[in-house]
């Protein structure tokens, strides 16, 4: 079963928390749709910022959005101007007050979303997929990962028949719930069609009690931006990877 299910959803409530933290009551459907629109807009708007994760927390009158990114300077802008502009744009999606926090991913080579999207962009740029995958594996293992597995599927090299190829190094124990495994599925649009790219990264094992709702907040003195553009990197830690 561990080989088939999404490794992230399989570990929810064990070593992984939810990306949406709120209680909706009778408005659950509307809030869920709003979250989907926010994520879709941010992923398109911040496509060049290497966004890894978007965490949304809601109170009665406030929506707190934490954007985990490898390139926080692109989102924050000079003096926090880009954050202010982003807040104004998001007010078209929700009628609540918005607070945006920026969290920097310290080691993007250990983040499956960033790795998968980088491979997809290279393949779309006509770089050989084997070269892109082998470079990603080497960079990830060099940064201290215990293992990585990458699968690419589709009409590879323009072949008539679609096929799948898998490359792996180290260990990725999908059945071990305490194993901190990050996963992502990305797509690369080529002239011959879509290529699917799946990435599994094992960042070690988590022992003891795990905080499922990581605290991204941080004091203003160590923040990276203005008006809610804070970097909460110190409070979000894992066994093997300080994201």
From Swiss-Prot:
GO cellular component: cytosolic small ribosomal subunit
Record domain KH type-2: where: 38-106
Domain of life: Bacteria
GO BP: translation
Region Disordered: start-end pairs: 214-243
MF-aspect GO terms: mRNA binding; rRNA binding; structural constituent of ribosome
PROSITE patterns to which the protein is assigned, alphabetical: KH_TYPE_2 (PS50823), RIBOSOMAL_S3 (PS00548)
Pfam families, per database record: KH_2, Ribosomal_S3_C
Keywords of this entry: Ribonucleoprotein, Ribosomal protein, RNA-binding, rRNA-binding
Stated family: Belongs to the universal ribosomal protein uS3 family.
PANTHER family recorded: 30S/40S RIBOSOMAL PROTEIN S3 (PTHR11760), SMALL RIBOSOMAL SUBUNIT PROTEIN US3C (PTHR11760:SF19)
Function: Binds the lower part of the 30S subunit head. Binds mRNA in the 70S ribosome, positioning it for translation.
HAMAP family, per database record: Ribosomal_uS3_B (MF_01309_B)
Assembly: Part of the 30S ribosomal subunit. Forms a tight complex with proteins S10 and S14.
Protein name according to UniProt: Small ribosomal subunit protein uS3
């Amino acid at each position: 079963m561990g080989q088939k299910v999404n490794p992230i959803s399989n570990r929810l409530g064990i070593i992984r928390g939810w990306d949406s933290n709120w209680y909706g009551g009778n408005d659950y459907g509307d809030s869920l749709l709003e979250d989907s629109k926010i994520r879709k807009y941010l992923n398109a708007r911040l496509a060049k910022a290497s966004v890894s994760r978007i965490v949304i927390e809601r109170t009665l009158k406030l929506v707190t959005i934490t954007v985990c990114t490898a390139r926080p300077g692109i989102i924050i802008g000079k003096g926090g101007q880009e954050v202010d502009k982003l807040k104004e744009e998001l007010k078209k999606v929700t009628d609540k007050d918005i607070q945006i926090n920026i969290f920097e991913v310290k080691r993007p080579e250990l983040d499956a979303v960033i790795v998968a999207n980088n491979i997809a962009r290279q393949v779309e740029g006509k770089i050989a997929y084997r070269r892109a995958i082998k470079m990603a594996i080497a960079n990830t293992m060099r940064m201290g990962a215990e293992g990585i597995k990458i699968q690419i599927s589709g009409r590879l090299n323009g072949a008539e028949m679609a096929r799948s190829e898998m490359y792996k190094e180290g260990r990725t124990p999908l059945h071990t719930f305490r194993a901190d495994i990050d996963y992502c599925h990305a797509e690369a649009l080529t002239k011959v069609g879509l290529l699917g790219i799946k990435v599994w990264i094992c960042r070690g094992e988590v022992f003891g009690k795990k905080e499922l709702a990581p605290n991204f907040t941080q004091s203003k003195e160590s923040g990276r931006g203005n008006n809610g553009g804070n970097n909460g990197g110190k409070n979000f830690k894992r066994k093997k990877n300080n994201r």
